[in-house]
Amino acid sequence: MDAWPRCLERLEAEFPPEDVHTWLKPLQAEDRGDSIVLYAPNAFIVEQVRERYLPRIRELLAYFAGNGEVALAVGSRPRAPEPLPAPQAVASAPAAAPIVPFAGNLDSHYTFANFVEGRSNQLGLAAAIQAAQKPGDRAHNPLLLYGSTGLGKTHLMFAAGNALRQANPAAKVMYLRSEQFFSAMIRALHDKAMDQFKRQFHQIDALLIDDIQFFAGMDRTQEEFFHTFNALFDGRQHIILTCDRYPREVEGLEPRLKSRLAWGLSVAIDPPDFETRAAIVLAKARERGAEIPDDVAFLIAKKMRSNVRDLEGALNTLVARANFTGRSITVEFAQETLRDLLRAQQQAIGIPNIQKTVADYYGLQMKDLLSKRRTRSLARPRQVAMALAKELTEHSLPEIGDAFAGRDHTTVLHACRQIRTLMEADGKLREDWEKLIRKLSE
């Protein structure tokens, strides 16, 4: 196809030559009409492309070919084009082509079995399992998973969809990104086929939509989604959604839609703690058949605090360089390989950023947060900021104390212990902590 060479030419201008040579040039493209399949010689390249380049590839192919629906597969491009497979997620009218294109097939790689559980995602995992086991149950319909990018929301959504299909292979499970819902609706409006559009959605057993925050400000899209939601909910078909924040915090979402989203169960997915991050690194390494010493996993987990995607990116970089150079993966090798990545991560979450974020969150002036005043309205946010600095940076206690108007390191230590103790009993403080972690990890 002509579009792929043009896409590759643009990618060569945007990414380092060694990356293009290693991950992108081995790909072979096949145009299937409603989708484009990129074939890679092995699963490792598929994973690299999915994690690092797929969003940009979709954008470029949408521009050059008018088609941004891309699937990745292991193998070689068939000599003769294969017929487009029937959409697994769409129930179409017998005599009409589906309005919703071949998009959103569930990725079978993502299951509950390979999801790494931790304190930050326990409730989300339990809720997704319940949704898969009891589809349509009003206690968790809709199920809304919210949190920053790269924390595992889509993994849980795919896992629930795959579990639904495993329990009932005939189940019509549709997964779409929010922009795909929008595009399908626009196409239906253009083709004067809104009845068919509605019929397709109303006939499915479960609807999974990613990133509903992008519906904000799209009045007609929200109206159609509102009616689709009502029809599915009334029919006891399950709805699973993700959002990058709690929906009531999304400006531009209609109040009636926010109200509907609150009918079921909303669960926050928070950044993983150190133990979970280390477990994720080790689990992802095993998936790739790579030998990663525990101390290397601990190093990555300690330095990369923001999200799972960054952990995987660091691991992929490490494994790829080890394969290219033939060197063993050691702590020294990891520090050398990830030096720039770790430095950027450290700079992104610095003490000044933490102080400003905490001050803004509690509605304080920076000078008050750093002052010597000990009123409760100032002391508690100040302790939270100190504890976050200890949690999210590599600074020592004395360095943190210096950044807080020259306080003693024992004051910082007391603040850290105090906040940890209070969070066990104070749900509001725990919620504040988790929200601040999410803000600082974005």
From Swiss-Prot:
Question: Which keywords accompany this UniProt record?
Answer: ATP-binding, Cytoplasm, DNA replication, DNA-binding, Lipid-binding, Nucleotide-binding
**Is the Nucleotide-binding keyword given for this protein?**
yes
Q: Which domain of life is it from?
A: Bacteria
**Which parts pass through the membrane?**
none
Instruction: State the compartments where it is located.
Output: Cytoplasm
Q: Which SUPFAM superfamilies match?
A: P-loop containing nucleoside triphosphate hydrolases, TrpR-like
Q: Spell out the family assignment given in the record's similarity comment.
A: Belongs to the DnaA family.
Q: What is known of its domains?
A: Domain I is involved in oligomerization and binding regulators, domain II is flexibile and of varying length in different bacteria, domain III forms the AAA+ region, while domain IV binds dsDNA.
Q: What is this protein called?
A: Chromosomal replication initiator protein DnaA
Q: Which organism is it from?
A: Xanthomonas campestris pv. campestris (strain 8004)
